[in-house]
Amino acid sequence: MELSEGELSHTSSSSSFVPVDQRQLQDAIQIIDEDKHFNTGILDYINKTSPADVGNNYHIISVFGSQSTGKSTLLNRLFNTNFDVMDESNRQQTTKGIWLAYSPVVSTTSGHTTSKSNILVMDVEGTDGRERGEDQDFERKAALFALSTSEILIINIWETQVGLYQGANMGLLKTVFEVNLSLFGKSKLEKHNEHKVLLLIVIRDHVGVTPVESLAKTFTSDLQNMWGSLSKPAELEHLRFADFFDVSFHALNHKVLQPKEFGEGINKLGDRLVVNNELFKPEYHHDVPIDGWTMYAERCWEQIETNKDLDLPTQQILVAQFKCDEIVEGVFQEFLSKYQHHFKEVDVDVDFAELGELFVDLRSDSLEDYDVSASRYNKAVYEQKRAKLRGLINDKLKEVFDVHAKKLCDTLLETFQKDLVALKGKDFAVNVKALSTKLVEQVVDTLSLMSLHGDISSNEITSGLSKEIDATIAKQQVIELNSIVNKSVKKLSGSLSKSIQFELGDPNDETWDNVLQMFKESYDKFGGDFGLGTSTTQNEQAIERFKFKSWCQFYDVTRKLISKEKLLALLQDRFDDKFRYDENGLPKLYLNEQDLEKTFAVAKQYALQVLPILTLAKLADGSEIVPEYDIFDSKLREEFLGAYDDSDDEDDHCFAEVVTEQEKSEVLAKFKKEVDAKYIETKRSIVQHITQIPYYIYLIILVLGWNEFMAIIRNPLFFSLSIVLGATVYVLYYLNLLKPAMLVAQRTMDEVIIMAKTKLREVLIDDHEVTGRQLNKIAGGKENIELDDM
């Protein structure tokens, strides 16, 4: 929007005490009027009045001070602006609101000097004016706006006001500093935020009796003390006054009594600004282009305007606040008595709909009682205190709300946990989502019944419930994931056992290749997202855990199936297969020692050829099986198995070594003993067979005893006995009991011979010798009896 010359002239008077060329003067624009409305045409004004593109090349200076202290005059004389000044014949408010003007030149000791930067000057309505009286709201907001948007804030003060509290506007500055700290102070916590504001204290009507240094010391001390008494937010307690502000002083003589010295003081201040350039510093600049500054200024005013800390109540409002507070207290106490009556004990089986209606009735009755007594007071205060009472009642009823909400959540959560466990991994993610959604909806619907039409928020409870649900789901997900891992490891272990047992039937050089291939097939199949809704990280960890456990199972299963006892049994079985049976699987009968020794050597070699294959897990290419993980690492075992091994076992474990060398030696020794024993036993049977009666003897006996043989056949009794005896011998032979029967018969015969010899000796020896021996036996027996009695 382009501003016309007429619009600018309407808002700024051309009257001024400044004797400068009127062609250089720039009319001011009112950026905030006395009704607190912000003018959005500032940027158009700046673009119209500045000679070139402003960009970042600008400075903002504002003035603050009491009414009728010559603030506008100071700005006009120093910056050659055209702000309205007071008519000396009629002391009254001149500047209303906040005005902004462009400074074409700055007054210096060398004349009017053009600044290298564009200088924009703000004239702020004076404080303590009779026009506004006790209403200090605009004064505070205007001062805070100037402080927030300016690089240099000129505080215009008479010498006689230095050291005063109200006279020096310390009370107003304290309020402004506190609100500025609460609104904009947190930005100071950001890194590399060195922004400050220069407080330029211009001491007016300085007569020179008190040195400027002494006045500066007094004023600075007052500022420091005031800063120390501010109510600061906790996170800003450590910040100092110097972190936000720099302070500089400049004294001016009396304008009327010492006009020449006054002008010289103005020019010296101009030198400090644009000639010596000692007052403009980079950290004072807002570091935004001019169009950004105008937007920032508008946002600052919006925030300041809506801030309640700058408002002060009137007497009428104070009365309304006191009476309404009194009414609120009385009504609330009456509400508490009803509250104690209804909620003295917590009902376990509560009807949430009825409880919600009771909440509404109790609150409505209390608010109606308040309305009857407080509605005649100031409307704003009445509504504010009504909202306060409503909040107190809501907070008290929320205590009951929270108790029942917790019981409800606990009950439903317990049911949810049972339903979750019952899923047992079937479409887990889908069903879990349905269950959790149903649970939350049920809780929200139930709590809404007693939420006082939404005044009692259930967000905190539902948020906590959601966290509980998530924690429960996460816990069950871990259980289900571990179950999947363990089941998969168990399945792999079973397949691995079958594969190894199959290979043990006929071990060869490719035995471990076949076992490893089967292992890899099951090993590589495990993966995916498992359908549990777990995160990628959890899935990856589960896969890692499965792989580690799988290699542990590989190690354990191989050592379980190929222990030294089972290895010894396997060697013996293989030896027996070659030593005791022929190629057709029939038992072998050795007739000579040469055949025995040859078969023994072959069988022994056949048995021992699998020993190096089974004791070391080695592939056909000669390489040992090496797992992807070091399953003996204690940290990995603790991570994946949850088992911490703090033993001091310093033995080097070898994954491929199924049977250790020591165990291998033990197996070989036992195997040698066993097969040697079988060899000796078999050889003894051959020798016995060789030392038996020759077969031709039986032929001779048959020829010589032919008559007796025929006599037996012709005799029915002898023939029957022969058949029975032959059948008995055949049965014993068939049952492989012939040798034991012969042994029993031989021992029986030996006993019979011994008894016969004894009887024969008794007959042949004299009776007196027999009698003597019997007496000796009796005497010996008696002695034995006596010894036993002793």
Curated annotation (Swiss-Prot):
Lumenal topological segments: 714-716
Question: Cytoplasmic side of the membrane: what ranges?
Answer: 1-692, 738-790
Recorded GO MF terms:
GTP binding; GTPase activity
| Major enzyme class | hydrolase
Task: Identify one Gene Ontology CC term for this UniProt entry.
Answer: endoplasmic reticulum membrane
Primary location recorded for the protein, binned into one broad class: endoplasmic reticulum
Say yes or no: keyword Iron-sulfur present. no
The residues the record assigns to binding GTP are G65, S66, Q67, S68, T69, G70, K71, S72
Which parts pass through the membrane? 693-713, 717-737
SUPFAM superfamilies named among the record's database cross-references: P-loop containing nucleoside triphosphate hydrolases
GO term, biological process aspect, one: endoplasmic reticulum membrane fusion
**Gene3D superfamilies per the record?**
P-loop containing nucleotide triphosphate hydrolases
Report which superkingdom the organism of origin falls in.
Answer: Eukaryota
EC?
Answer: 3.6.5.-
Extent of the signal sequence: none
Q: Identify the InterPro entries for this entry.
A: G_GB1_RHD3_dom (IPR030386), P-loop_NTPase (IPR027417), RHD3/Sey1 (IPR008803), Sey1/RHD3-like_3HB (IPR046758)
Where in the cell does this protein reside? Endoplasmic reticulum membrane
Q: Which residues form the GB1/RHD3-type G domain?
A: 55-284
Pfam families named in the record: RHD3_GTPase, Sey1_3HB
| Record's bilayer topology term | Multi-pass membrane protein
UniProt KW keywords: Endoplasmic reticulum, GTP-binding, Hydrolase, Membrane, Nucleotide-binding, Transmembrane, Transmembrane helix
Record's family?
Answer: Belongs to the TRAFAC class dynamin-like GTPase superfamily. GB1/RHD3 GTPase family. RHD3 subfamily.
Query: What is this protein for, i.e. what is its function?
Result: Cooperates with the reticulon proteins and tubule-shaping DP1 family proteins to generate and maintain the structure of the tubular endoplasmic reticulum network. Has GTPase activity, which is required for its function in ER organization.
Name the HAMAP family for this protein.
Sey1
- Full protein name: Protein SEY1
**Species for this entry:** Candida dubliniensis (strain CD36 / ATCC MYA-646 / CBS 7987 / NCPF 3949 / NRRL Y-17841)
Q: Which gene encodes it?
A: SEY1
